[in-house]
């Protein structure tokens, strides 16, 4: 056992030391401490300890006496433990992150003077933190929620924090409403229920009463709110920023991140189950992908509107509850981000990282977006509450460029500032402000005129047009998922006033949608609407418009289900091909001890059928073998694996005798299987009944109608889900 532990520790150490480095990672290495056999236990003040098991006490041969308060070692250990926790983030408490790099491949010098967006030879270190919004730090990953997508760029000119979400709009236009929208979404105050959910009275009461939230809650009820992976979701800056170029010209901009792997989501039943079966699903998925070298990547894009064109649209471009439709303002992709290194320790890096929307570099600025103006105060203020006034001196927050100013003192000050002056101007002319030529930050000379008032422009008062645009732009399956989501959420609202009024609000999006939901949740069905659906659509709102450039199974998890007597030829070929395509084969057996193949070879499964679930994989494959198929056909959990994977619309592959096993488990006449030596695909179920020696020897080509079994099966996996099963109602015909 000690040898196994030693090997595990060595493997973890090698993973960290072999991971890609960067200027920021090198900076952090000064803070590293290695925990290994050569080290000896000490106090925080460096004195070596002889034991960590016994408090200093009065003892005799036959009894234990009182513990002594004089023991400094014991008191330090307890005191340190008692004070380990820092204030939890009010929102975005549940998070995970990674290091990486950012590079522009097309200079945006026409828009900005910021080298991070113009210098194509530069590679900028980044740390990215993904998060849910409503849940506490210990809540589940797969809840229905907005996901935070925050990027800290460690540029040579200072830190730039792009603090966004996986949804491009927000619930409110003005930051003054932030306490209300979050209070309404958090657990209800009288009983602290529910955790990390929007399916309750207060959330939906706020949505009805605050009509500007209508666009955002349609996104929150879409598949965007239950991503398959953090690596498979878009990111958006949400707010309207500005870019200023070297000629002093300003553009309004929105920032976009688009994943290389495409935009994919869980299905709702799967998300619900995973919240209990594997509450760390997203966190582990990101870690596993990076550890396996399947580094997630995103394209970085900019939407830009010239200052003189600010008022040319029927919406206000400073309104955070509105998108800039891409058919009106195309996204220009100029760069790429790759995450390639896991954190060395969660707390001092992922937990203590502090993002501030106010952290920008020269060439990037702020618009008058009223939500952004308030965020610039709120984010900075909350970091002081969580981490103290010197939070930017923490290693993870520390810039990689020189930092010099006359800020002094405060709790947990790390910097030792030498010299005899701590002010400017001073007699030495020490640390003077930088000139523009030296890279000093240039504020745009914006002319402002008006009256002081608590008011918004007329365009800010239109709240339904883009909610309709989003709903209209969904594919049929995405619309059905939104209907199901509204039905689930409002079913959990006990107050008839809440779900009754929300049905009426949905009529402002689409009358048919409202009538369908009314029947599901028991509200009065509206017959008219004050805001008829305008019928317009736009591009790149549906997730179906973001497939990978080529079909791929990269980083997908494929379960191979075996039992004694399995076909080792099919197993070996599938395992090798899955690995070769950068996917992750997971062997599942009736037990975790070794399973014997038909030829006498053995393999030890990664998990057993009861210890793992189909929810945790993207596809399942069952190789043939008469004895194995018979064993699995009598195993209720094995049959449930097949049925659940089918119900969740996942690719299912089977060869040889396992074909009949799959047919028995699904038992639907619409789903047909192979009966000869030809590969057959039906609703994403790929089968090959009669296996020939050459069945697995051909090179695997991932394509529709591929000649080989594995090519066809991998293509089914690459489609993410077989939506036809749901559109044709097959998924609801079996129990899972």
UniProtKB/Swiss-Prot annotation:
It holds the Pfam family DJ-1_PfpI. The keyword Metal-binding applies. Its main location: secreted. The active site is at 92, 165. PROSITE patterns: CATALASE_1, CATALASE_2, CATALASE_3. There is a cross-link at residues 356-379 (3-(S-cysteinyl)-tyrosine (Cys-Tyr)). Induction: During prestationary growth. By ethanol and in the presence of air by heat shock. Inactivated by isopropanol and 20 mM 3-amino-1,2,4-triazole. Keywords: Cell wall, Glycoprotein, Heme, Hydrogen peroxide, Iron, Metal-binding, Oxidoreductase, Peroxidase, Secreted, Thioether bond. Heme binds at residues 89, 129, 178, 375, 379, 386. Glycosylated; with alpha-glucose and/or alpha-mannose. GO terms for biological process: conidium formation; hydrogen peroxide catabolic process; response to oxidative stress. Homotetramer. Occurs in almost all aerobically respiring organisms and serves to protect cells from the toxic effects of hydrogen peroxide. This is Catalase-1.
């Amino acid at each position: 056992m000690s040898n196994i532990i030693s090997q595990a520790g060595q493997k973890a150490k090698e993973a960290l030391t072999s991971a890609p480095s960067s200027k920021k990672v090198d900076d952090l290495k000064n803070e590293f401490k290695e925990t290994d056999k050569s080290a000896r236990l000490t106090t925080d003040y460096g004195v070596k300890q002889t034991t960590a098991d016994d408090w200093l006490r009065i003892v005799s041969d036959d009894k234990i006496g009182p513990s002594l308060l004089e023991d400094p070692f014991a008191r330090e250990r307890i005191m340190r433990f008692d004070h380990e926790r820092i204030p939890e983030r009010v929102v975005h408490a549940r998070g995970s992150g990674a290091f990486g790099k950012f590079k522009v491949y097309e200079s945006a010098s026409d828009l900005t003077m910021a080298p991070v967006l113009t210098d194509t030879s530069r590679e900028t270190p980044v740390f990215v933190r993904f998060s849910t919004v409503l849940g506490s730090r210990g809540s589940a990953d797969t809840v229905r929620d907005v996901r935070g997508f925050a990027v800290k760029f460690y540029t040579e000119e200072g830190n730039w924090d792009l603090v966004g979400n996986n949804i491009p709009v927000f619930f409110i236009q003005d930051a003054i409403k932030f306490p209300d929208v979050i209070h309404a979404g958090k657990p209800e105050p009288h009983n602290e229920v529910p955790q990390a959910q929007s399916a309750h009275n207060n959330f939906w009461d706020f949505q009805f009463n605050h009509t500007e939230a209508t666009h955002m809650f349609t996104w929150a009820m879409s598949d965007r709110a239950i991503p398959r992976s953090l690596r498979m979701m878009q990111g958006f800056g949400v707010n309207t920023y500005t870019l200023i170029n070297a000629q002093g010209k300003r553009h309004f901009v929105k920032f976009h991140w688009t994943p290389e792997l495409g935009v994919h989501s869980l299905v709702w039943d799967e998300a619900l189950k995973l919240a209990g079966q594997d509450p760390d699903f997203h966190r582990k998925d990101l870690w596993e992908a990076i550890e396996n070298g399947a580094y997630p990547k995103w394209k970085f894009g900019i939407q830009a509107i010239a200052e003189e064109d600010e008022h040319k649209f029927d919406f206000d471009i400073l309104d955070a509850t509105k998108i800039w439709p891409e058919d009106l303002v195309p996204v220009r992709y100029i760069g790429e981000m790759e995450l390639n290194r896991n954190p060395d320790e969660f707390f001092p890096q992922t937990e203590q990282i502090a993002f501030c929307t106010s952290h920008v570099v020269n060439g990037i600025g702020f618009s008058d977006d009223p939500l952004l103006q308030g965020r610039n105060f709120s984010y900075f203020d909350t970091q002081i509450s969580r981490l103290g006034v010197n939070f930017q001196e923490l290693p993870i927050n520390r810039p990689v460029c020189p930092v010099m100013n006359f800020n002094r003192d405060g709790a947990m000050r790390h910097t030792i500032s030498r010299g005899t002056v701590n002010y400017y101007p001073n007699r030495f002319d020490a640390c003077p402000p930088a000139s523009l030529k030296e890279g000093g930050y240039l504020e745009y000379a914006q002319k402002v005129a008006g009256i002081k008032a608590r008011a918004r422009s007329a365009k800010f008062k239109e709240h339904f047009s883009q909610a309709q645009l989003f709903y209209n732009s969904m594919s049929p399956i995405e619309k059905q998922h939104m209907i199901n989501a509204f039905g689930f959420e409002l079913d959990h609202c006990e107050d008839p006033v809440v779900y009754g009024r929300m049905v009426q609000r949905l009529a402002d999006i689409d009358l048919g949608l409202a009538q369908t939901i009314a029947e599901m949740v028991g509200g009065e069905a509206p017959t008219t609407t004050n805001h008829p659906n305008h019928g317009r659509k736009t591009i790149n709102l549906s997730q179906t418009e973001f497939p990978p450039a080529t079909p791929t199974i990269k980083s997908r998890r494929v379960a191979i289900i075996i039992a004694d007597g399995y076909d080792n030829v099919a197993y070996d070929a599938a395992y090798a091909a899955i690995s070769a395509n950068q996917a992750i084969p997971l062997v599942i057996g009736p037990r975790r001890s070794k399973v014997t193949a038909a030829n006498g070879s053995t393999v030890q499964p990664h998990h057993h059928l009861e210890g793992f679930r189909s929810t945790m994989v993207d596809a399942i494959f069952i190789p043939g073998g008469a004895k194995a198929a018979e064993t699995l056909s009598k195993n209720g959990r094995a049959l449930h694996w097949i049925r659940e994977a089918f119900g969740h619309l996942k690719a299912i592959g089977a060869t040889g005798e396992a074909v009949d096993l799959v047919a028995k488990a699904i038992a639907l006449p619409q789903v047909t299987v192979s009966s000869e030596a030809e590969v057959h695909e039906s609703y994403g179920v790929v089968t090959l009944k009669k296996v020939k020696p050459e069945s697995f020897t051909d090179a695997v080509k991932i394509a529709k109608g591929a000649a080989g079994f594995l090519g066809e099966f991998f293509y089914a996996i690459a489609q993410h889900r077989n939506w036809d099963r749901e559109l044709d109602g097959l998924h609801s015909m079996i129990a899972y």
